[in-house]
Amino acid sequence: MAKFKRTDTNRSLENLLDQDKSAQMSKNGGSLAKQPTRKLIPGHGLEFNNLSYSVIKKVKKDGVWINKEAYLLNDISGQALRGEIMAIMGPSGAGKSTFLDALAGRIARGSLEGTVRIDGKPVTTSYMKMISSYVMQDDQLFPMLTVFETFMFAAEVRLPPSISRAEKKKRVHELLEQLGLTSATHTYIGDEGRRGVSGGERRRVSIGIDIIHKPSLLFLDEPTSGLDSTSAFSVVEKVKDIAKSGSIVLMTIHQPSFRIQMLLDRITVLARGRLVYLGSPTGVAAFLAGFARPVPDGENSLEYLLDVIKEYDESTVGLDPLVLYQRDGIKPDQAAKTPVRKPPKTPKIPRTPYAKSPWTKHISLKSSHFSTGNMNSQRDPKDHSDQQSDVNNFDYEDDDDEDEFDKSLERRAPHTPMSMQSGVYPRLASHFYKDFSVWLYNGVKGTPRRPPTWNNNGAIKAPISGSGFKSMSSSQFSMTQQTPGPGNKTPIFTPGRDVIEYSSYNPSYEEVFEIEEVLDEPVHRHKFANPWVREVLVLSWRTTLNVIRTPELFLSREIVLTVMGLVLSSFFKKLSHFDFKTINHLLNFYIFTICLVFFSSNDAVPTFIQERFIFIRETSHNAYRASSYVISSLIVYLPFFAIQGFTFAGITQYILHLNSSILSFWLILYSSLVTSNAYVMLVSALVPSYITGYAVVIATTALFFLTCGFFLKRTQIPLVWRWLHYISAIKYPFEALLINEFKGSKHCYDGDLSDLSPGPLGDVKFSALRNNSRAALPQNCTLIGEDVLFSMDIREENIWLDIVILLAWGVLYRLFFYVVLRFYSKNERK
């Protein structure tokens, strides 16, 4: 049995067992073929241990749909250091972007397992967002802003107000020079319809936005996708300069050229969410040579590694030989060198044989050379054939009972590193498992791979079995302090708040666990760099620039309302006459006016959907508040709505000589534009595409149109659907326009009652006002305006009440819009 120094607290349970096993095998003369690895430096840079992520998907089995757990990441461990670039590579579907999201804290904590540490300390998601930036694969930028204006906006929202505007401009010019964008300083970003910067420059602008505040960590998702080799090399070269300034840079990349490979410091190669290689790009050839698959002359080592991965992935043995070799340096046997190809087969769900114990759900593949203690374990290569046979013959669906499982452990413990699908640590001796299971059954709520969180405030003394190991204070068994209070947050990727009790277990000896410091945001630090008012001003400035430089956003609706005002005026003539035909013409004119205003707001659907992706990118790291965005967009568009409403009201009032008040007419149209725009933006925030957005807006607006009281009066709508009449946003401006036109007894209408039918007025009803003032009315006054309102089932004859209710709907739509942006527009995996 190997001797362990009790002062060494940075050793994992599995690593100590590896050392014990290595000592036994060395005594027996065993040896292990080593594969080239790059040793990790504990307590430095970004460390990630045992990251696993699974999702539930529905699959059809025997004609029945069942839920199946699919693992996108499977027990990945490694490290990224400051001043270096770590590239995440792998074939399509390997989990590169998922892995990057896991490190960046963009996966919901409940669905991700493992630990992420910075300089040896666990971190919270809020702290990770505070010190890092994430550059998405797609360049979501405003096309009508220049490069300088884009960077200046980022500086205004990312840098605190304590930094003067001159210093912010200086930082922008430094960034332009650092990214090689000096020549494109005043060039528009551009898009498909507008000429702007090149693809490589556009990508560098996207990177510059997220490094304006000099983050410690930079995550980039496919920064070279869609670029030619020269532009891609230029982008990575600038990223290399960023890393040299002291940042930790991690990026996914699909097929780097040889020149780009030479810029990378470390690469992490994944395959189906499993770690295949971690080390220097120059070490890939030695890795493959040790795997008995030397790189052919003239071949690129990384590309050849991807070919080998594909070959094994499609074979009967799967990826296990590659993963085992990366993990333990175990070479495959002769049969595994040339795998027999087979049709792709959907893997079955890994299941834990010992179902009663609360083992972690993800599959254990902890690499001994990733541990912070002993870097290499010793194994007997003679036993690999037995091991490989066990791997190939393992049945995913068989569950052994406890006795059979204990016996299998006793048989396999001396020589077999079990398959990854077994869910059991291969090097656990049977006697240790029995002791450990007792510990589990006496109050453990967590799992061996994800330790529970302690509630004690002081140092915690936890008794542990002394069967061949010293402590569990490693990254795999880290204990984090839970301090009461509102400022306390659970460290990222750590388990829940369950409590462990050891009341009935007598340990061999006791070990004191030191409570780790958790890196979190300072208690008094503001989440956002700027106050709310300043954010509104800066966002309003940018939105105004976009509207001015994109005149079609304003002119298109202005032209529509102008042209339609002229067309309507030519259709509806002599509306100043006081006959029965005029009543129907007025009703038709006003309902068409309101529908025109509502449907003209549909152009906001594609506009906001484009902005939504920019909003998600900018707010993913707390650039500004969602409320600031909502209010700023409203402030900028209010004067444009006023101009548009006055244009239509002025044209129609002047040509048709309407008897209504032009001020009230304009105010009703203005309120309708504000409310309809709020509704369209709410729908745009909920739908995935502008096509769906158009469909939803048109369908709901048509429903509002049907139930507003024009086609079916309130009393004619079935009782079960009458609530639609009151939530119809068209009802209130329509009624307000009619009240503005017909209220009171100052207008008298005469004619044949047959002129009212067919028409929206229907059966004529005489109002109480007419009955009370019959004697004062002229002899030829058959109907007064009040009778028209009474016949249309309009009872509350108050223009201001209708306007207030209409604006209240607009406020409610804006509030819902804010809620969607605040809580449901997060770029985070569940």
Swiss-Prot record:
TM region positions: 552-572, 589-609, 631-651, 662-682, 691-711, 799-819
| Main location group | membrane
ABC transporter domain location: 46-297
Q: Which residues lie on this side of the membrane: Cytoplasmic?
A: 1-551, 610-630, 683-690, 820-830
Molecular function GO labels: ABC-type transporter activity; ATP binding; ATP hydrolysis activity
Annotated region (Disordered) at 333-356, 368-422, 471-491
Glycan attachment positions: N659, N771, N780
Q: Name one GO cellular component term.
A: plasma membrane
What are the recorded Gene Ontology BP terms?
Answer: response to symbiotic fungus
This enzyme's EC code(s): 7.6.2.-
Feature: compositional bias, Acidic residues: 395-405
Q: Which UniProt keywords apply?
A: ATP-binding, Cell membrane, Glycoprotein, Hydrolase, Membrane, Nucleotide-binding, Translocase, Transmembrane, Transmembrane helix, Transport
Q: 4Fe-4S: is it a keyword of this entry?
A: no
The conditions that induce or repress this protein are given as: Regulated by RAM1 during arbuscular mycorrhiza (AM) formation after inoculation with Rhizophagus irregularis.
Membrane protein topology class: Multi-pass membrane protein
Sequence ranges of Low complexity compositional bias: 471-483
Q: Which domain of life is it from?
A: Eukaryota
Enumerate the Extracellular topological stretches.
573-588, 652-661, 712-798
> Where does the record place it?
Cell membrane
Record-listed ATP binding positions: G90, P91, S92, G93, A94, G95, K96, S97
Q: What class of enzyme is it?
A: translocase
Record CDD domains = ABCG_EPDR
Q: What job does this protein perform?
A: Together with STR2, required for arbuscule development in arbuscular mycorrhizal (AM) symbiosis.
Q: How does it assemble?
A: Heterodimerizes with STR2; the resulting transporter is located in the peri-arbuscular membrane.
Which protein family is named in the record?
A: Belongs to the ABC transporter superfamily. ABCG family. Stunted arbuscule (STR) subfamily.
Q: What is the protein's name according to its record?
A: ABC transporter G family member STR
